[in-house]
Amino acid sequence: MLYETIGIVRPGNIAEVKELVLTAGKLILNQGGVIRDIKNWGTFLLPRPISTNQQRHNRGHYFVMRYDASIATHEEVRRTMKADPRVIRTANVKLGDGKLETLSRFGAIPWRSLEEA
């Protein structure tokens, strides 16, 4: 199955974001999954303040990861992200059913940065 995870990590240290993505990536690869794309969207204001782990956040560092994995692997990635105190919020979406004609509709992750506007 093709999945997409959008994660928001507490801002300030890019090494934390890299470590978190590396952990999730290793988990996917070790269980036979394939990582299709990873994008670093950078730090942005959150739509509203979010409180997690007794901290209030107004900004977050966004990243997107698109990958093929089994349902069990996807659930483990979700649990790992949810348990990590560096993560403010994640959103997970199932994009495809694993068939080639379905997967071919999804290209690169679209993003228009502020510099391009």
From Swiss-Prot:
Keyword Iron part of the UniProt annotation: no
Cysteine disulfide links: none
Domain of life assignment: Eukaryota
Cellular component terms per the entry's GO annotation: mitochondrial small ribosomal subunit
A Pfam family the protein falls into: Ribosomal_S6
Example of a GO biological process term: translation
Gene3D superfamilies to which the protein is assigned, alphabetical: 3.30.70.60
Major localization class: mitochondrion
Gene Ontology MF annotations: small ribosomal subunit rRNA binding; structural constituent of ribosome
Keywords: Mitochondrion, Ribonucleoprotein, Ribosomal protein
UniProt subcellular location: Mitochondrion
InterPro entries: Ribosomal_bS6, Ribosomal_bS6_sf, Transl_elong_EF1B/ribsomal_bS6
Function (record text): Component of the mitochondrial ribosome (mitoribosome), a dedicated translation machinery responsible for the synthesis of mitochondrial genome-encoded proteins, including at least some of the essential transmembrane subunits of the mitochondrial respiratory chain. The mitoribosomes are attached to the mitochondrial inner membrane and translation products are cotranslationally integrated into the membrane.
Subunit structure: Component of the mitochondrial small ribosomal subunit (mt-SSU). Mature N.crassa 74S mitochondrial ribosomes consist of a small (37S) and a large (54S) subunit. The 37S small subunit contains a 16S ribosomal RNA (16S mt-rRNA) and 32 different proteins. The 54S large subunit contains a 23S rRNA (23S mt-rRNA) and 42 different proteins.
Recorded family membership: Belongs to the bacterial ribosomal protein bS6 family.
Protein name per Swiss-Prot or TrEMBL: Small ribosomal subunit protein bS6m
